Amino acid sequence: MTTPSKFRDIEIRAPRGTTLTAKSWLTEAPLRMLMNNLDPEVAENPRELVVYGGIGRAARNWECYDRIVETLKQLNDDETLLVQSGKPVGVFKTHANAPRVLIANSNLVPHWATWEHFNELDAKGLAMYGQMTAGSWIYIGSQGIVQGTYETFVEAGRQHYDGNLKGRWVLTAGLGGMGGAQPLAATLAGACSLNIECQQSRIDFRLRSRYVDEQAKDLDDALARIQRYTAEGKAISIALLGNAAEILPELVRRGVRPDMVTDQTSAHDPLNGYLPAGWSWEEYRDRAQTDPAAVVKAAKQSMAVHVRAMLAFQQQGVPTFDYGNNIRQMAKEEGVANAFDFPGFVPAYIRPLFCRGIGPFRWAALSGDPQDIYKTDAKVKQLIPDDAHLHRWLDMARERISFQGLPARICWVGLGLRAKLGLAFNEMVRTGELSAPIVIGRDHLDSGSVASPNRETEAMQDGSDAVSDWPLLNALLNTASGATWVSLHHGGGVGMGFSQHSGMVIVCDGSDEAAERIARVLTNDPGTGVMRHADAGYQVAIDCAKEQGLNLPMITAQR
């Protein structure tokens, strides 16, 4: 028996156009989106099936990938494929309105939900880390997080700088699949940014895709550029090759004062995602194989240094926040008792949006034709005519965001508007205005689909941060509503033991049956976010539930 392989020297790209390689668009769509996740324009390390986020994979190994592709090509529209941690394990007869694929990734019984146990299973070929959209086949490159990061920076600017980030600069680190959105998001928000990254290949990737503008030669050069650009009121992003655990303390020592500090290194995974200070990347990867415990310890010690520097900036009055990579938790475990003194980005800036079911709604053109996305952009503006902020986002996205793989768009909208847009897109497919079907999905980072006490559900006002019934209910409801594929994951964003979350994708193929499914899914999915926050007592969510006519028996029911 051959050993399953996680490496293959191959380039994968999703088919384009209207010729089907599967039996229908309901199975062609997950096939193309799986392949798109591994497109070299999209994935961080596609030859090892890694899409983003440390070791977030699209399939468990290449043999599993091959079998998933073969199965999707043969799957009928009354069958459902079950995928267990990146491995196709069964096909069962269901019905036409059931999901075509159901996915469960990285889920462990809570007592065993640790990186140590997961890594043992991974080494034996028994598990796969799916991150959020890697193993659920709806990653669209760094664009997928750009708007969320942009909204965060804009809201921070409103709270701390009277809504004007001109002449200001953001200090951060990490230019991977998620962190790579930061420089462009800061630029779009009107600020300069200094973005520290320890791998030159990642800087090169972001320079090619125009997510970062320039690379500095060294720290002195970077600071000189920041000083010049902020004085000129320009919003320019600068990458700097280096280690944040070395550079941030040096900035504190020099008395440098940024206007905002955050971080998006892959601190959630100390074995694979955070380079210890003083180490080369090659040493880090080699020692991860030979002495993983020592590597984890060294990485977490460096995170403690990194967080202490962030705390020092906060103590100077600099707005400082965690951007959801669990670095505060790692530092706390290394003795930084006050690591949580600076907040996470969700309670600080994003939760009011979640209360209204607003989150990272995204869609991709299965045709591969950018014009299909531009036509949907215009349709969004037509259907939401009075939202100047949203229109500005769409204009900036078209001008500045390079498509990676299949053309796609991210657009934060909430309950009511998601269904309205989805039905309009389906009608555009029906009439031929769009050249092929559209898929609509979202990040698992959404209002009703995640339990993550150090990120999305941090500091819930009723103390329900760790209650994970909500993403389970979300996945169950999306399955019952007829999403095309539904996923339920553990550990995304913040690592093993710290989150559970669910995702959905639905196909707009122009049919009447699709319209019925779209209306259900794109109402019920954000509806669970409003429900979750209303249940926690947020008045904004309670008001939204009443306005939208949600039936919440303990809250909105008439007595």
From Swiss-Prot:
Where NAD(+) is bound, by residue?
Answer: 53-54, 131, 177-179, 197, 202, 243-244, 264-268, 274-275, 323, 493
Q: Its GO CC terms? A: cytoplasm
The cofactor required is: NAD(+)
Q: What is its main location?
A: cytoplasm
Q: Which InterPro entries match?
A: Urocanase, Urocanase-like, Urocanase_C, Urocanase_central_sf, Urocanase_CS, Urocanase_N, Urocanase_Rossmann-like, Urocanase_sf
GO BP term (any one) = L-histidine catabolic process
Q: Report the subcellular localization.
A: Cytoplasm
* Protein family membership: Belongs to the urocanase family.
What name does this protein carry? Urocanate hydratase
- Organism annotation: Pseudomonas aeruginosa (strain ATCC 15692 / DSM 22644 / CIP 104116 / JCM 14847 / LMG 12228 / 1C / PRS 101 / PAO1)
Provide the gene name from the record. hutU
